Amino acid sequence: MRHVTLIQLFNHPITQKFVKRSGMAHAIACAFHAYKLSKKYNVNPDLATKAAFLHDIGHYTWYRNGKWDYNLYKQNDIHAIKGAERAHKLLIRLGEHPKSAKEIALAILLHTDSYLPQGELHLNPLQQVVALADEADEEPSGEHHYRTISDERARKMLAELDELVALALSQTT
């Protein structure tokens, strides 16, 4: 059973503020990639699409002399940490099951290793799907965060993805 849809997430003011700031078009593209990857890796598509959609909700833009500074961002990046907490609070507020909210938050926390010390990170399948979905939409120097999409188009795409997820879940139960 789905407690929260992508459209509900999209419509929330927190999502509007923070996901738009980090790139709504990128978030939606990642959610679609995650849906496809969830089938390949036998992962719950509801959790995968939500985690991919919210994976950059913790982004903060780093500026130097009034210009976006990608290197400064990379040096100081903790967006996955901030994003995991922000997404968890949002999901709980909207009525997501606590266990699902935790799984989604952990996938967001581990979708990138940009803030972790060097070493090998072992991800579970959901976490792998979210990381791969993000990588599938990356552009050099973070340009994927600056693609734009209208609210109307975003709602239409997320409604379509909500339908695909609901159908996939109905076929597994």
Residue ranges of model-derived segments:
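Divalent metal-dependent phosphate-bond-processing catalytic cores, especially two-metal-ion Mg2+/Mn2+ enzymes
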Residues: M1-H3, F18-D46, L54, E96, ...
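A generic structural signal for nonpolar/aromatic side chains embedded in well-ordered alpha-helices
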Residues: F10-P13, I108, V130
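An active-site-proximal "capping" alpha-helix that borders the catalytic cofactor pocket
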Residues: C30, L37, D77-L94
